[in-house]
Amino acid sequence: MAYLGKVYKFDREENFDGFLKSIGLSEEQVQKYLQYKPSSQLVKEGDKYKYISVSSDGTKETVFESGVETDDVVQGGLPIKTTYTVDGNTVTQVVNSAQGSATFKREYNGDELKVTITSSEWDGVAYRYYKA
């Protein structure tokens, strides 16, 4: 778990706009999210983890326990249930809401982080890449 504590900065993305459109965002919202190029960091604190995302909009910290479902609210006030599972160099986040589910699979490989994004409402796959 050499990736713990490393800061990964956004590098590039593939098909992210397709994912955003599939979850019903307006063109204006899609354009805003396409500008979202955060850095991310995962820290372990005892039995819990803290996922830290920093962007021009500020800092968001999410504390979770692997395999335990938590309640959260995303931009726009939509309530969601999220489960993070940590397995070696992979952190899988499953998000469930009234609109469906999405999976964010974060694969850490040295100084690279690849996030694979899928959704129950979309046949496509999106990727976001980060570098430490």
Swiss-Prot record:
One matching Pfam family: Lipocalin_7
Transport as UniProt keyword: yes
A GO MF term: lipid binding
Keyword Transport carried by entry: yes
Subcellular location: Cytoplasm
Tissue localization of expression: Midgut.
The protein's assembly and partners: Monomer.
Function, as annotated: Binds fatty acids in a 1:1 molar ratio.
UniProt record similarity statement: Belongs to the calycin superfamily. Fatty-acid binding protein (FABP) family.
The name this protein goes by in its record: Fatty acid-binding protein 1
Organism: Manduca sexta
Classification lineage: Eukaryota, Metazoa, Ecdysozoa, Arthropoda, Hexapoda
